[in-house]
Amino acid sequence: MASLTHLDATGAANMVDVSDKAATARTARAEGAIVMRPETLRLIREGDAKKGDVLGTARLAGIMAAKRTHDLIPLCHPLLLSKVRVECEPDAALPGIRITAEVRVQGPTGVEMEALTAVSVACLTVYDMVKAADRGMRIEGIRLLEKSGGRSGSYAADPA
């Protein structure tokens, strides 16, 4: 089992020193979903939510969140991200919205947390924008789908 890189010999939390690591291409993809009543999904699809464009706002919130991950997660490094893509897809089978994020960087550390943060905040934004219609919505299934680059190599999640 790999050691925890954010803990020193005494068990205290520390930001990992990446100053000696080479900048390499790194990518991460994450997913999540927000499950809601069919009527709530219909409001979103038809553009009838009182707060406006739910999916567009959630997409932008996810992008902004990826860029601010270092402000939200204490031991994350600030990164010069080269790409953040957030997709919000209505899914009647849930019913709800499936959200995915892809983040890229040319840097000394990975972007898994940025992808996960983008999905999380996009889901929270959907909740915020339609909570007046459906307070029983559930955010679920947030996970890393895949990552590539860096010393630890590639990772792909088992199919759900």
From Swiss-Prot:
Question: Catalytic site residues?
Answer: 128
- EC numbers on record: 4.6.1.17
- Record keyword Lyase present: yes
Domain of life of the organism encoding this protein: Bacteria
State the protein's name: Cyclic pyranopterin monophosphate synthase
Q: Which family does it belong to?
A: Belongs to the MoaC family.
Residue positions binding substrate: 75-77, 113-114
What Pfam families does the record tag this protein with?
MoaC
The protein's assembly and partners: Homohexamer; trimer of dimers.
Reaction catalysed by this enzyme: (8S)-3',8-cyclo-7,8-dihydroguanosine 5'-triphosphate = cyclic pyranopterin phosphate + diphosphate
UniProt KW Nuclease keyword: no
One function term, GO molecular function aspect: cyclic pyranopterin monophosphate synthase activity
GO terms classed as biological process: Mo-molybdopterin cofactor biosynthetic process
Q: In which pathway does it act?
A: Cofactor biosynthesis; molybdopterin biosynthesis
